[in-house]
Amino acid sequence: MLYPFSALLARMKYITRWSLMHSTRAESLSEHTCDTALLAHLLCLIAKHYTGTPCRPEVVAVAALYHDAPEIITGDMPTPVKYHSPALRDAYKALETESVRSMAALLPAELAAELTPCMDGTALTAEEHRLLKAADRLSALIKCTEEQRSGNHEFDAALTQQRAALQAMQCPEADWFLEHCLPCYTQNLDELTKL
């Protein structure tokens, strides 16, 4: 028997994010997923060492690797469309749920039982889910920052929206990252490596 789950996951590299906006550099879902997993792990370490928020860094990082897996089936729905109305938000949530179910069906039952909670977020506590959501937003904020730094004003409003959304989350780990890490994303290689 063949199980196409991982081959389908590999197609994340073909899904372009920010599809309704002019980008100086395209970003694939695969790139975003990796960035989000790295950020989620770091936010968990910040929680562990600085804020005391209980979390499992490895579990959150793995869940981050699968957090947008349903988009392989649904595509990347632009945020303004996804959250335009409660009806659209609910319909998209139902579509995501069905996508997770469809993808899990591409695995043997015992593997599906372990991966489904990573794809649908049920593997996470409320605090861990908040950290993953903050990492997802930070990834978007970093993309907007990079685009703006490249002179692309198409992302100005998105940058403002991402900052406001992060602030509204009242996530001390994200606040720590914004203060101590985000400014480095505007530095050049020599400044980053202090050569």
Predicted features along the sequence, with ranges:
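Alpha-helical, largely C-terminal catalytic domains
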Residues: 1-195
